[in-house]
């Protein structure tokens, strides 16, 4: 079994903001597959599906970004999913808008959602699908991550969302992190 979790903040106020890149990516995947998040438990919206013959949990934590680990760890513990079978979709300010990078493990890079997951899973050894939102140029970090993408930026993100569907499918199919990094980084 695999868990794919997109990170973001709940509520319409945060809908379509840069910090909700994880939610937007997972929503794109769900839309492409004709699926929806039909359960509310483990402090998240989620669904359990069979995709290409594999059991998969698709999750959007509803704890706010900084406490995402609570939701991810609750569902991983309940379904007995090992951390290496977890893929977290996150925004990354250290990469250009729409750039994708796969990581098999590592520190949080200052991302509070990832810090929370490391704390609550008790390990850094889980997979990440990072999508760039770049650092702000003439505004604060908080203002930057809580604003939507402009039209030009959104086109780059749409390409990233399309590529992410392939990455998620490869992860579900059991492709290891080294394969994913070689193919998509």
Swiss-Prot record:
Main function: Hydrolyzes ribosome-free peptidyl-tRNAs (with 1 or more amino acids incorporated), which drop off the ribosome during protein synthesis, or as a result of ribosome stalling.
Which positions does the site annotation Discriminates between blocked and unblocked aminoacyl-tRNA cover? Answer: 9
What catalytic activity does the UniProt entry give for this protein? an N-acyl-L-alpha-aminoacyl-tRNA + H2O = an N-acyl-L-amino acid + a tRNA + H(+)
Positions of the record's site feature: Stabilizes the basic form of H active site to accept a proton:
91
Main localization, broad class: cytoplasm
Annotated keywords: Cytoplasm, Hydrolase, RNA-binding, tRNA-binding
Q: Cystine bridges: which residues?
A: none
Compartments (UniProt record)? Cytoplasm
**Family of this protein:** Belongs to the PTH family.
Whether Cell inner membrane counts among this entry's keywords is no
Tell me, which GO biological process terms does this entry list? protein quality control for misfolded or incompletely synthesized proteins; rescue of stalled ribosome
Q: Which HAMAP family match?
A: Pept_tRNA_hydro_bact
Instruction: Please give the GO cellular component terms listed in this UniProt entry.
Output: cytoplasm
Q: What is this protein called?
A: Peptidyl-tRNA hydrolase
Ligand binding (tRNA)? 14, 64, 66, 112
Instruction: Indicate the residues that form the catalytic site.
Output: 19 (proton acceptor)
Annotated source species? Lactobacillus helveticus (strain DPC 4571)
